[in-house]
Amino acid sequence: MKWVKVTASVILLSLSGCGSEHLSHSHDHHAQAHHIANAAVLISEGETKIMFDPLPLSGFGVYPETPQSDIAQMMAGEGNYAGIDAVFISHAHSDHFSAAAIIAYMNAQPDVTLVAPRQALDMMKKDQDWDGVLQARMRIVDMEAGDAAETITIGDITATAVRIPHAGWPAPKRAAIQNMVYRVTLNDDATVIHMGDADPRRQHFIPHKEHWDETRTDTAFPPYWFLTSSQGSYILSDEMNVEKSIGVHVPLEIPQELKDSGQDYFSKSGETREINVERSPE
């Protein structure tokens, strides 16, 4: 081992620099977003972990699907998927949700809480492997568009759910879908939003302005079409009080308009982003 001699003044200077750096960043915190596939995202902050839409039935050849290796790790509770606290389902469309897969996952991971719309529960109840005992570990949101936000608390996780119409509204089949926008705060620290397949029209978001203003969102995960329109971008930054957005639900063939937008988005399984949380000193 080589020993390097340094003067006392250098040591003091180094310590001084470290101290000032520590002070300048003492109110910066970090969480991480891990892209699973399509609209599926894993969020971790310390020991707290949540997933959004992790087990879709199919991508229908249009959207990327959750890799089989990731599914195996989820079921085993290994790797990135060890210690998951809660799973949030945005809506009961097959490119976001599989009743059979979620039932299997809940049976394999008995400590996980599921947050889902009523329509997802209805589909699970029709599955041959449904067991009513699972419902005790579920938080079901059943609301109409325009209803006030509902608050859900799971340990160190505080979430709200707001029903925002599915893209394609007001077509009846789209309007009937319970599409949930979740705002989730982990450990009273990092706050994220997942939007499912929300329709990008301001009229859906304006009635909830007070709700959005209550909490600054560090990172939102909107469907990519919010990032390719001026109205969608305005909704995120000005209506929803979002600091940063990362697009999801990106097709296998990435739209050129998204490539040209300069916006950040997830398109490959395993991509990660740091979620920077900046809070003012108290």
Protein language model features and the residues they cover:
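Sec-dependent signal peptide recognition
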Residues: 2-9
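Zn-dependent metallo-beta-lactamase
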Residues: 13-67
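Active-site environment of divalent metal-dependent phosphoester hydrolases
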Residues: 39, 58-59, 93-97, 121-124, ...
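Pre-active-site segment of Zn-dependent metallo-hydrolases
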Residues: 48-88, 100-102, 199-215
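Active-site neighborhood of phospho(di)ester-bond hydrolases with catalytic His/Asp-centered motifs
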Residues: 52-55, 84-95, 115-118, 193-198, ...
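Active-site HxH/HxHxD metal-binding segment of metal-dependent hydrolases
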Residues: 75-145
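Binuclear metal-ion centers of metallo-dependent hydrolases, dominated by the metallo-beta-lactamase
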Residues: 128-155, 234-282
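Active-site-proximal loop/helix segments of hydrolase catalytic cores
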Residues: 165-239
